[in-house]
Amino acid sequence: MTPPPPKRQKRDEYRKATAEATSQSGASDVAEIKLPKKKYYRQRAHANPFSDHHLKYPLSPAHMDWSSHYPAFVDPDPSHINLAGARRLLKDVEVVDIGCGFGGLLIGLAPLLPESLIVGMEIRVSVLEYVTTRIQALRAQQQKLRAATATATAASETPSQQQAQIDGKQANANAAADAASPAPSTDTEHMPTTLVPGSYENISAIRSNTMKFFPNFFARHQLSKIFICFPDPHFKARKHKARIISETLNAEYAYALRPGGLLYTITDVEEYHHWILRHFGVELGAEEESEEKSTSPNANANAGVRELFERVSEEELEKDECVRVMKEATEEGKKVARNKGNKYVAVFRRKTDPEWPA
């Protein structure tokens, strides 16, 4: 009797089968397209950002090839290429989710910002593979739904039914989608049963170490929004240098973020929330207060970074739909809600660069 295959072999076989099913599904088998299951993409919760991972990164933002990530937005003119010889896009990437995890925020933002290109940055290999497979499955499902809707619309177009077809177009599309799509389960949550704005063509994910290569991907003032959701708190003092919020990294975020752009943060650790506020100049700790009284170069440098951001008021946050998605759509946000924990939100607006003195 042949023993059952080991867990790793099961995971590899499942991933291969899922990828093939997504790429080879025909126009008539919408129900066969399913989202990947997380249990086959397990990985450790953390990755050391200071290790020398085998990462591919562009020489500069002008060398980055985005064409494979957003095929629906590739410039139709083949002569429009970047410095690396890759096809250009019709628009630039302008929304970034740093540490995108399993892609909950990307999926939630896709229909909310259908005209904006959104990218998730993740350092863990298996997690990135899950997000990529998930996005491909959602895109394939949307393509099948569009084809089914177009077929149903063409069949119903007669002179006597034209007005009724116009009035009931959306209802027919929803009914066709519901009939073709399976009911969501625990492993296939958020499976869309109707067409969504953008059809998930505006989201993608890349493997990258943000702490090392963030400026290699994004040019000055390119981004309109940056999301940092439930980052690793690194509780030990000797590990604070690995936190994704710091004076140095905040300066890089300010470089890529355009004036008026927003940097969103959310955490369930109150101490880390105050760390964020201190590093954006909203709060002052004991060390910062002593530095302010001194004339050390370090104090001046910290003040310079803090002058680039201002905190967004609570009144504005209540009207911002992205804040709601950040709280409710992310996997960590759902886990905190299940455990009835607290969520600490802070959003900062990029100020206009000060003018050079005359």
Swiss-Prot record:
GO terms for cellular component: nucleus; tRNA methyltransferase complex. Gene3D superfamilies: Vaccinia Virus protein VP39. The keyword Transport does not apply. Its EC number is 2.1.1.33. The active site is at 232. It comes from the Eukaryota. Residues 151-186 have a biased composition (Low complexity). One of its GO terms (molecular function) is tRNA binding. Pathway: tRNA modification; N(7)-methylguanine-tRNA biosynthesis. Pfam families: Methyltransf_4. S-adenosyl-L-methionine binds at residues 99, 122-123, 209-210, 229, 330-332. InterPro entries: SAM-dependent_MTases_sf, Trm8_euk, tRNA_(Gua-N-7)_MeTrfase_Trmb. Forms a complex with trm82. HAMAP family: tRNA_methyltr_TrmB_euk. Belongs to the class I-like SAM-binding methyltransferase superfamily. TrmB family. This is tRNA (guanine-N(7)-)-methyltransferase. It comes from Aspergillus fumigatus (strain CBS 144.89 / FGSC A1163 / CEA10) (Neosartorya fumigata). The lineage of its organism: Eukaryota, Fungi, Dikarya, Ascomycota, Pezizomycotina.
